């Protein structure tokens, strides 16, 4: 139906006859000549309909409105001198219309496609097929496609096999809640949609596939949180006979090539390696943004004997922490601004936000401003200023509480201060976080949970700690963090059946339950399982970062809302009683439900 895309025409096509198809972006009537901007996936081209050149096509053009779908035949010509549009890829040429065919009319869309207006997300998602006509929305999908194409190319060239794994699988007791699918042929039993292909890709390693990858949909019925999707896309990777350093180096090469090809931006390798403990100590969280030149500083040892319980008690508590965060030039902050930051850290459980302003450091206590100075001896103040490297004009904030609260609150404050005060450096700052603990203790459940997942291998030198001191056992896990966002996580896996059973028992999964839920894996590990490991990257989040999008929903073709609903289709919805009876399911309806 067409010979060219609208957006690919240039002076190289002058005097050629072309056939174009697309949507009317805008129609203008200027002095008896009609101009139509025709839009397709590749861009815009200006069409000219002159009654003296083609009276019939001019009459048709008079009836055309925005978003009508057209087929147009015409001749490419230079735009008249002075009417060129340097902001448009096709701005040097136009098409003189010879024949116009209306392929389909359009009602007035719920929002304009051709204008950069702020449109509410609810209506954009409800009419997502209109929203995706907007150049910026369509460009994100093109970019997403380019990223996936480049990643596939890299892995294909290095011997990785693209292999599908099942979507209908077994529900497992670890991780987020599963989406369950009732089985009609096995009444009362359920499949689960996969949270990841984890177990199947490990079985592929047992099978001798050696190198596997897959661009795969994953499903997690998580509690509602901002910027989370119940279904998302992963680049899933697994390989045999390698150590973590080999895999990390390969992934660095993949990202370096991706950024060079798609963004034309260099990434310097090797990426920074940072132990988990260092990340928490210096940045308060396990996904630090290294573009922000602010660090947390431990001062608990200085505060153990001060006559100020707010500091002394957590400093003496085994699970407590007292940390400082210096903001260069922050001495100019007003009382109102400090109060706003105090309210901000309260979101993370902090009971307050102590501070000291450094006016003239050389004067000691007299050169400082703070309501807490009266509680601190001169030697503590001096040591704190020395350790934080505070200078005149700075402000030093303090967090004192359980270590988890201090880390989370000051870690979040560090990021906010960096953005509020223009301290975030431009560019890309990738790093690996390594040496994670194998387990974390759940105070509510009074049991251990796997920090990553139960199939992660402990470090060989820490194997004995599985029985002696699980909290001190480190894993062979690694997370890739990019500008403060975790984009991927992986590990070397457990390849011995007895170690896997030991980890299950430690997590409260008894032998009977382990056999019921994971028996196929435990059996497979007994049949010559190779050492293996892998990683999975969240493609949606990676595309969001690389496109500079504000939300993950911007880079997913048909996303769900924050309430895990689809405004476009109305999902989730009720189903007919006959379908439920066929599945052997009864539904207890709420009084508010529609019947």
From Swiss-Prot:
Q: Where is this region: Aspartate?
A: 198-201
SUPFAM superfamilies of this UniProt entry? Class II aaRS and biotin synthetases (SSF55681), GAD domain-like (SSF55261), Nucleic acid-binding proteins (SSF50249)
Q: Which GO terms describe its cellular component?
A: cytoplasm
Keywords (alphabetical) are: Aminoacyl-tRNA synthetase, ATP-binding, Cytoplasm, Ligase, Nucleotide-binding, Protein biosynthesis
Catalytic activity reported: tRNA(Asx) + L-aspartate + ATP = L-aspartyl-tRNA(Asx) + AMP + diphosphate
- Cross-referenced InterPro entries, in alphabetical order? Aa-tRNA-synt_II (IPR004364), aa-tRNA-synth_II (IPR006195), aa-tRNA-synth_II/BPL/LPL (IPR045864), Asp-tRNA-ligase_1 (IPR004524), Asp-tRNA-ligase_1_N (IPR047089), Asp/Asn-tRNA-synth_IIb (IPR002312), AspRS_core (IPR047090), GAD-like_sf (IPR004115)
Electron transport keyword on record? no
| Lineage: superkingdom | Bacteria
Q: Does this entry carry the keyword Ligase?
A: yes
- Enzyme Commission numbers on file: 6.1.1.23
Q: Where are the transmembrane segments?
A: none
Residues that coordinate or bind L-aspartate: 174, 220, 452, 493
Entry GO MF terms: aspartate-tRNA ligase activity; aspartate-tRNA(Asn) ligase activity; ATP binding; nucleic acid binding
Site (Important for tRNA non-discrimination): give the residues.
30, 82
Give the first-level EC class, as a single word.
Answer: ligase
Compartment annotation: Cytoplasm
Q: What family is this protein classified in?
A: Belongs to the class-II aminoacyl-tRNA synthetase family. Type 1 subfamily.
Q: What does this protein do?
A: Aspartyl-tRNA synthetase with relaxed tRNA specificity since it is able to aspartylate not only its cognate tRNA(Asp) but also tRNA(Asn). Reaction proceeds in two steps: L-aspartate is first activated by ATP to form Asp-AMP and then transferred to the acceptor end of tRNA(Asp/Asn).
Protein name, please?
Aspartate--tRNA(Asp/Asn) ligase
Source organism of this protein record: Nitrosococcus oceani (strain ATCC 19707 / BCRC 17464 / JCM 30415 / NCIMB 11848 / C-107)
